[in-house]
Amino acid sequence: MGIQETDPLTQLSLPPGFRFYPTDEELMVQYLCRKAAGYDFSLQLIAEIDLYKFDPWVLPNKALFGEKEWYFFSPRDRKYPNGSRPNRVAGSGYWKATGTDKIISTEGQRVGIKKALVFYIGKAPKGTKTNWIMHEYRLIEPSRRNGSTKLDDWVLCRIYKKQSSAQKQVYDNGIANAREFSNNGTSSTTSSSSHFEDVLDSFHQEIDNRNFQFSNPNRISSLRPDLTEQKTGFHGLADTSNFDWASFAGNVEHNNSVPELGMSHVVPNLEYNCGYLKTEEEVESSHGFNNSGELAQKGYGVDSFGYSGQVGGFGFM
């Protein structure tokens, strides 16, 4: 008799209705900055893996939390021993940057960069494009160990599978039909609701029956329309002197102005100068999220870092 696998979600003991929808700023300041400074988290929602050792469709099973998108802390290796370009080879293919970088700021200070990448199967530059997307968050001036072969000790990655045009068309048609029927006024509330459910079931079934080029066992059946975000172009950032992320994270922890529900958080000012340097890759933030995290319950205590157990703008308790 084999050993029964433990569900990571069950181990977290999360309250009903828990959602994790952090903003770009929250991911950068409250998670990546603290991770780079060596702090632990009272609630582990982001797994630590070497993301570039796996194909993206394997990653959902390695995540600690998530249904439609998954978060990971991962190191980033150099492409060449003394170079500054990252190695993007992963699993059976490679990640390719696309579009424009987005600079993440807090309290008017630039703290990190968000990069969007698409996974291709095969060898560059003749790989086959898939619908798997990665948003990579990295610090502007990461802390690096002397002589390290890694470009970054930690970056934070959001992984998700983009909805195809065929899936989106089926979704839109189903919603339109359901709304049209609901607005006719010829049926009772009960029959309208029943028909709405039938329509939803039919187009979800149609989605499941379609054959896509890159199907995998972790395909998600719950689909939603693509979201868009404003893209910010920039020429680059200067290589400043090593910034003390440990001190910065310590200030964040020491600051007692941590918000309750719905209040904006306070982050100390970062006193350093940013210059400019030429970027080597073009990237696109094709799928942004601006809604904050949510918790369905209240009344939790304060953890060792001074963060309230109530739901706040940070998306964790």
UniProtKB/Swiss-Prot annotation:
Name the tissues where it is expressed.
Expressed in stems, flowers, cauline leaves and rosettes.
Relate the induction remark in this record. Induced by drought, high salinity and abscisic acid (ABA). Slightly up-regulated by jasmonic acid. Not induced by cold treatment.
Q: Which terms are listed as keywords in the entry?
A: DNA-binding, Nucleus, Transcription, Transcription regulation
Q: Which GO terms describe its molecular function?
A: DNA binding; DNA-binding transcription factor activity
A matching Pfam family: NAM
PROSITE patterns in UniProt:
NAC
Q: Which residues form the NAC domain?
A: 14-162
Principal localization? nucleus
User: Which InterPro entries does this chain map to?
Assistant: NAC-dom (IPR003441), NAC_dom_sf (IPR036093)
Subcellular location field: Nucleus
GO CC entries = nucleus
One Gene Ontology BP term is:
response to water deprivation
Any keyword Transmembrane helix? no
- What job does this protein perform? Transcription factors that bind specifically to the 5'-CATGTG-3' motif.
The protein's assembly and partners: Dimer. Interacts with RHA2A, RHA2B or RHG1A, but not with RHA3A or RHA3B.
Supply the domain comment: The NAC domain includes a DNA-binding domain and a dimerization domain.
UniProt name for this protein: NAC domain-containing protein 19
Q: Can you name the source organism?
A: Arabidopsis thaliana
Name of encoding gene: NAC019
